[in-house]
Amino acid sequence: MKDFLQKITTEGKAMYLAYDHGFEHGPADLPGKSIDPNYILNIAVEGGYNAVILQKGLAEKYYTGTKYQKQVPLILKINGKANIWQGGDIYSYQNCSVQYAKQLGASAVGYTIYLGSAHDGKMFADFGRIVEEAHKLNMAAIAWVYPRGEFVKDETSKEITAYAARIGLELGADMVKIKYSGSRENFEYAVKAAGKTKVVLSGGPKVSDEEFLQIMRDVIAAGAIGVAVGRNVWQHPEPLEITRKIREIIFS
């Protein structure tokens, strides 16, 4: 099977700078300089990230055809939702085609699946099609799999996190992005469940440096290939310094 992740990994490891938060969480998650996409893209370049993760509007206006396109690969997030609606089950609609992502210069596409939502079957079908379309265009397909819904009692439990990882494998994802499940042992179970689909950690909300770096040590020891980190870098007062510490853990 072809390695579609080659353009966005280094010797099988990966460090991605995620910046799809403006869509998903709103400007409240983008304090200070982080509201400026150029600030984020400069961190991605100077920090040596394997890719930056953007929604299509940011890619159109700040990445495609700019100096950044030659300096850091792009993972285009092709679905999303706002966080204002708090009721009922979630369905995250696709807002960009795989073909258009390719035109924007993306090396990979990302798609969120809410495992446990009443609409997860639609998202499974969407992502299955997206994988096929991406591979035809020599692009990687990455699944963000987040357990949500009435019947999900603990979205970061050992079993449900492993189930999220397994969904990525079953749907043909090249990589699956999942949340931390509380310990190295628990995360190792998720990595095993993912089989030949590579696993990266979802960086999550801003926490202390010590806590985040320990989580990074746990997941790399468990077999994850890296992280897609956002707030713990660009909300940090010294984003390049915390990047250096993350890099040491992943690539040492």
PLM segments and residue spans:
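N-terminal basic/disordered segments at the start of proteins
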Residues: M1-E11
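Alpha/beta enzyme core
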Residues: A14-V52, K56-N83, G87-V199, E210-I225, ...
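Thr-Gly-centered strand-to-loop micro-motif
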Residues: L201-G203, V229
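A C-terminal functional module that forms or caps the active site or interfaces directly
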Residues: K206
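Short acidic/histidine-rich active-site segments
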Residues: V227-W234
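Short glycine/proline-enriched turn or capping motifs at secondary-structure junctions
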Residues: Q235-L240
